[in-house]
C-alpha cells in the first residue's frame, strides 16, 4: 500500500490510496568441480515474474599455483523495475507503467598473490547493460492524447557499458598491535551507448580509495 505509488484502490485505507503487488519465484541449479589446480563452477536459473520467465546463467573458473591465483568468469542478470520506476510522478517527472526488466551480462578477470602475512589482488570487469531504466529528459513527448513539454520521463532506452578495476593489498597477523590492514582502490567509468539525456544513470563515483 502507498499514498502515491501503485494503482488506485477501489476503497482507500486511511492515507493509503494506491496499491500494487507482484509475485516472483526463482529456481537455481549450480555445479562445481575441482581438478588438480583448477576449479570450475557453472549455474543456470530461471525467474518466474509477471513479465514472464527469465533465464540467467553464470560461469567461472579459477587456477591456483602456490601463492598465485587467477580467475575469470561471466554472468547474466536481470533487474525488475521498482515501483518508483513504474509509478512515481511529480510536476517534473512522468511515470511509465510499461517498463520491462533490465538485462545485463558482466565479465570479469583477475588475479591475486599471497605470501605469509601479505596479500594483493586485482580484478577487471565489464558490464554490458541493456534496457537500463532511468529518468530521460524530453523537450516534447506525446502520450496518448496528451503532449508533455520539458519533463523527465521514466524510460529504458539506455544501453550502458561499465568498465571497472578493483585492486587491494593488505597485511594480516595473529599477533601484534596491528593485526590487519588493507588498502583498496576502485575505478569506474561508464559509457552510455544511447544518445539521450538522463538524470542519474551516469551519477557514480569514478575513484574510490579506502
What are these regions (language model features)?
Residues 33-39, 126-128, 146-210:
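Gram-negative outer-membrane beta-barrel transporters
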Residues 21-25, 53-55, 103-107, 114-116, ...:
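Residues that define the transmembrane beta-barrel architecture of outer-membrane proteins
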Residues 2-6, 13-58, 61-108, 124-155, 175-185:
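Surface-exposed extracellular loop regions of Gram-negative outer-membrane beta-barrel proteins
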